[in-house]
């Protein structure tokens, strides 16, 4: 069982990142792959959860230990698989997620892709009062907007839209926010993706 891997980020795409460790490239499925774009070819530490099935072994990567622990809590809930858990964690407002669980805010929880009312209620039921130190350590990650004007159909925007689809948002949902993202002042795919998630959570 792995706790974390430390190596070079050699590839980033909408579904995963590749981390090269001592000549071996590990494919890590992560909540927001483009978070690692600025770390390309740099040594980073990524926390890891290993899932073993009859047909494959999948590695899930996390920015820090809190994110990993929150993922493990989420997949313990009936109806929440690894893909759904990653889609939930893609929204960097983990403190908002934890507050929603503690306050039985079902409306907030159903905004995540693949989470209906029944599953949202199950999340609150199973995890309320069981998050321990996560409730104290969760932090709100702010977004930084760079004043560059409209970016049009930039490669960064296209990558962000693909990443939203990979997280499970429907084509209709992604299309609805595309005009706002086109006008959003951003420089990187990660910034577009964070803004897209913020807009989808407001629906």
From Swiss-Prot:
Record-linked InterPro entries: DNA_helicase_Holl-junc_RuvA_I, Hlx-hairpin-Hlx_DNA-bd_motif, NA-bd_OB-fold, RuvA, RuvA_2-like, RuvA_C, RuvA_C_sf
Source species, domain of life: Bacteria
Positions of region (Domain II): 64-142
Region spans: Flexible linker: 143-153
Role: The RuvA-RuvB-RuvC complex processes Holliday junction (HJ) DNA during genetic recombination and DNA repair, while the RuvA-RuvB complex plays an important role in the rescue of blocked DNA replication forks via replication fork reversal (RFR). RuvA specifically binds to HJ cruciform DNA, conferring on it an open structure. The RuvB hexamer acts as an ATP-dependent pump, pulling dsDNA into and through the RuvAB complex. HJ branch migration allows RuvC to scan DNA until it finds its consensus sequence, where it cleaves and resolves the cruciform DNA.
Subunit description: Homotetramer. Forms an RuvA(8)-RuvB(12)-Holliday junction (HJ) complex. HJ DNA is sandwiched between 2 RuvA tetramers; dsDNA enters through RuvA and exits via RuvB. An RuvB hexamer assembles on each DNA strand where it exits the tetramer. Each RuvB hexamer is contacted by two RuvA subunits (via domain III) on 2 adjacent RuvB subunits; this complex drives branch migration. In the full resolvosome a probable DNA-RuvA(4)-RuvB(12)-RuvC(2) complex forms which resolves the HJ.
Family indicated by similarity: Belongs to the RuvA family.
Protein name: Holliday junction branch migration complex subunit RuvA
Organism of provenance: Latilactobacillus sakei subsp. sakei (strain 23K) (Lactobacillus sakei subsp. sakei)
């Amino acid at each position: 069982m792995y706790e974390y891997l430390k190596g070079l980020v050699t590839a980033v795409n909408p579904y995963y990142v590749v981390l090269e460790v001592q000549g071996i490239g590990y494919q890590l499925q992560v909540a927001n792959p483009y978070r690692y774009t600025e770390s390309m070819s740099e040594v980073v530490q990524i926390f890891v959860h290993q899932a073993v099935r009859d047909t494959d072994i999948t590695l899930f990567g996390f920015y820090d230990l809190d994110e990993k622990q929150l993922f493990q809590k989420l997949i313990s809930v009936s109806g929440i698989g690894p893909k759904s858990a990653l889609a939930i964690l893609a929204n960097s407002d983990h403190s908002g997620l934890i507050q929603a669980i503690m306050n039985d805010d079902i409306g907030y929880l159903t905004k995540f892709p693949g989470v209906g009312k029944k599953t949202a209620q199950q999340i609150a039921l199973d995890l309320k009062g069981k998050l321990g130190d996560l409730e104290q350590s969760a932090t709100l990650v702010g977004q930084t907007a760079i004043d560059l004007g409209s970016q049009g159909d930039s490669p960064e925007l296209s990558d962000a839209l693909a990443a939203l689809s990979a997280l499970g948002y429907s084509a209709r949902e992604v299309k609805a926010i595309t005009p706002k993202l086109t006008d959003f002042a951003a420089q990187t795919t990660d910034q577009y993706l964070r803004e897209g998630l913020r807009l989808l959570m407001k629906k």
